[in-house]
């Protein structure tokens, strides 16, 4: 009994630390701390295979814990193991289908495995849940522009992003991109 309680406590502390850090990073990055023409992914926190393996064990031991699957997906994404992250994010969405952050991260992973249409689909699913999620619009704009060549759709997404985050550090760059795309028509 004590061992089970100890394992549960260790699990909760690990998840809280990882999930809390990821949420804080995402909040900082949602203000637009991103480079041009790349889907925005917060800086990698977890890279070692051992750390990912520990989170995988924790998620499998607690399969009904959405946060465990999110933490695993985040770690896999940070380690650029995008296909595995997609599976983990799908598991978390089975438990919490309205998590927009997970939808956006999963979209980024779809781009990472060369499926830009699926990436945009996930960003748009996130936008249906929360139309005011700036990163969904920014990342959709980037994929639409850079990967799919759908500039007019990209402009709309970038404009919505700027409406939601007008003072983002990358706002001037995004405005320039919009002007370039509009003048190229």
Predicted region positions:
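Canonical tetratricopeptide repeat
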Residues: 71, 105, 139, 174-177
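Structural marker of alpha-solenoid helical repeat scaffolds
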Residues: 61, 95, 129, 164-167
